[in-house]
Amino acid sequence: QNKLLSVIAIIGTALAIAMIMCIVLIYQARTANYEPEINRDRTLSIEMTIAQKIDDKGWNMGNQLSLRTIKECFYPMTTAEAVSAVHYSMTSLAATPDGTREVKCAVSYTDDNFWRVFGFRFLHGKPYGQEFVSGEKKLVVTRSLARRLFGIDNAVGRIISLGFVDYTVCGVVADESVLAEA
C-alpha cells in the first residue's frame, strides 16, 4: 500500500539480484575455459615452493621452481596428462636484427609441452618441439607483435632479437583473450 516501501523493496531486490549476478560472472571469468586456457578446469599450477630442513627449524621459500626440481619431480609424473614449465619474465625489448623497430613485450619462456596444455590458435607456422632442448633459438609470437615489428601477420622464418639474442620465429598465434591469465 505504501509506495515508498514498495519502491525500496523493489530496488533492494534488484540490487541483491545484480550483486549475485556480478559474483557469478566474476567466478565464471576466473574458472571457465577461455582460449588459450582451454584446460583451466583441469590444470594444477605450482607457483612457489617452501622447503624446511629436517634437522633444524630453518626453511627456505622461493617464488619459482628450479629447473632441477622440475626435471626430477614433475617431468617424470605419469598420472598427469601433460607437465609443462613456464617462466614468466618481465617486459623485454623485442627488436628486428637491424634495430629499426623495437617493441616492448611480455616474454614467457616455456617448454614444448606448453602447447599441449594451452590451446593457442596458430595462424602461421607451428609450435617448437623438442628442438628447444638442443638449444635452438625459436619462438612463437602473437599476430599483434608480428605486425608491430614486421608490418605483416606471417613472420615465420624472420629473426627477432630479445635481450641481444637472436631467435627465429617458428609460429604466429592469434592474440589472446583479456580473460586469459597465461
Regions found by a protein language model. Name each.
Residues 86-87, 97-127, 132-133:
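The feature marks short, hydrophobic/small-residue-biased sequence motifs that occur predominantly
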Residues 23-93, 101:
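Membrane-proximal extracellular/periplasmic loop immediately following the first transmembrane helix
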Residues 111-127, 139-182:
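Mid-to-C-terminal secondary-structure elements
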Residues 50, 54-69, 82, 98, ...:
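Small-residue transmembrane helix packing/gating motifs
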Residues 2, 9, 30, 46-48, ...:
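Generic structural signal for small/hydrophobic residues in well-ordered secondary structure
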Residues 4-31:
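Short, strongly hydrophobic transmembrane alpha-helices
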Residues 94-99, 163-165:
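Short strand-coil-strand connectors
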